Amino acid sequence: MAFDFPDQFRFADSHEYVRQEAELVRVGLSAYAVDQLGDIVFVDLPEVGDDLSRGTSFGTVESVKAVEEMYAPITGKVIQRNEAVLANPEELQNDPHGEGWLLVIRPSELAQIEELMDSATYSAKVAAA
């Protein structure tokens, strides 16, 4: 299956994406990862105000196939979480790159974004998987 990964996104090896929005960053799970999970039934996210460290678990996503941890693609503080996804996990499945976003983070270091894969690199990675 071919996926369309937005050019303005950057991706972590663990399939989370970031989209910079001024001094904040929106975080979500890539369409590829969501597709691999199948029907999503539960999402667990950190609280607003929590500090995240790049590479550490910040929550889980549960599907009919598996429970997977999600990892912070950058270090920062949670400013907002998507309550709609928590209430209705199908939102993540229906529109992972849009309304299915997970968190808004105030990054500690914006430079960490540049260390993530661009959409072309990520697309090649998942195509080879």
Curated annotation (Swiss-Prot):
Keywords, comma-separated and alphabetical: Lipoyl
Cofactor note: Binds 1 lipoyl cofactor covalently.
GO CC term, one of those recorded: cytosol
PTM-bearing positions, type N6-lipoyllysine: K65
Cystines in this chain: none
Pfam families recorded: GCV_H (PF01597)
Domain Lipoyl-binding: 24-106
Domain of life assignment: Bacteria
TM annotation in the entry: none
GO terms of biological process kind: glycine decarboxylation via glycine cleavage system
Cofactor section: (R)-lipoate
InterPro entries per record: 2-oxoA_DH_lipoyl-BS (IPR003016), Biotin_lipoyl (IPR000089), GCV_H (IPR002930), GCV_H/Fam206 (IPR033753), GCV_H_sub (IPR017453), Single_hybrid_motif (IPR011053)
Family: Belongs to the GcvH family.
Protein role: The glycine cleavage system catalyzes the degradation of glycine. The H protein shuttles the methylamine group of glycine from the P protein to the T protein.
Oligomeric and partner information: The glycine cleavage system is composed of four proteins: P, T, L and H.
NCBIfam families in the record: gcvH, PRK01202.1
Name the UniProt record assigns to this protein: Glycine cleavage system H protein
Record organism: Synechococcus sp. (strain CC9311)
Gene symbol of the encoding locus: gcvH
